[in-house]
Amino acid sequence: MLTTKQKELLLFINDRIKDTGVSPSFDEMKEALDLASKSGIHRLITALEERGFIRRLANRARALEVLKLPDSAIPPPNARQRRDFRPALVTNQGAEAPRIAGMIPLVGRIAAGSPISAIQQENGQVASPGGLPEGDDYFALEVQGDSMIQAGILNGDTVILKRTNTAQTGDIVVALIDGEEATLKRLRRKGASVALEAANPAFETRIFGPDRVEVQGRLVALIRRYE
């Protein structure tokens, strides 16, 4: 299953090859996805290659071949002209399922450990735990990892988050790092820097410049199932 970034890049490459017969340059791909550096494109291409969606052709410049597209792939309108794209951890790129009152969309998995590429596909809905203010926009993610165990968040839990791009120091948030990797951590502001702090001494606090971290949601509730 592809992340939104991977799918966006795959469709961009596929469209460009169809139009021109040549795959786009790394600079063109970086611009199309609005990434800060080409290293992010390298990682996305490697991930697509490992998953069997593309391959690199030897001894040819700008040589990428699209081997397949996801079954659900529907190229977004004006994909080649999009310059306002911003990473969105929880934006569903396909048709949305009908919303049911009292239900919250489950949009994928989130790392409570080392950052991982978040899955950008709606996986159903979960019942609202109740007590949440009406009128706010919520989403749910399944937790992978144990970096937040001392905050009471365990591997396999489902976290409910309020969709927001702002947070106070000390809030537990979904953070997007460099527009690619997502993690669930406690946010601390240290001067001009942003620290993503685990609640497990086995994990180090990671510190970034403010332009490298984008808050996607703030933790408001947790659901745990006992088998």
UniProtKB/Swiss-Prot annotation:
Residues 26-46 bind DNA. Its EC number is 3.4.21.88. GO terms for biological process: DNA repair; DNA replication; negative regulation of DNA-templated transcription; proteolysis; SOS response. GO terms for molecular function: DNA binding; serine-type endopeptidase activity. It is an enzyme of class 3 (hydrolase). The record marks 112-113 as: Cleavage. The active site is at residues 147, 185. It catalyses: Hydrolysis of Ala-|-Gly bond in repressor LexA. It comes from the Bacteria. Gene3D superfamilies: Umud Fragment, subunit A (2.10.109.10), Winged helix-like DNA-binding domain superfamily/Winged helix DNA-binding domain (1.10.10.10). InterPro entries: LexA, LexA-like, LexA/Signal_pep-like_sf, LexA_DNA-bd_dom, LexA_repressor, Peptidase_S24_LexA, Peptidase_S24_S26A/B/C, WH-like_DNA-bd_sf. Keywords: Autocatalytic cleavage, DNA damage, DNA repair, DNA replication, DNA-binding, Hydrolase, Repressor, SOS response, Transcription, Transcription regulation. It holds the Pfam family LexA_DNA_bind. Belongs to the peptidase S24 family. Homodimer. Represses a number of genes involved in the response to DNA damage (SOS response), including recA and lexA. In the presence of single-stranded DNA, RecA interacts with LexA causing an autocatalytic cleavage which disrupts the DNA-binding part of LexA, leading to derepression of the SOS regulon and eventually DNA repair. This is LexA repressor. It comes from Hyphomonas neptunium (strain ATCC 15444). The gene is lexA.
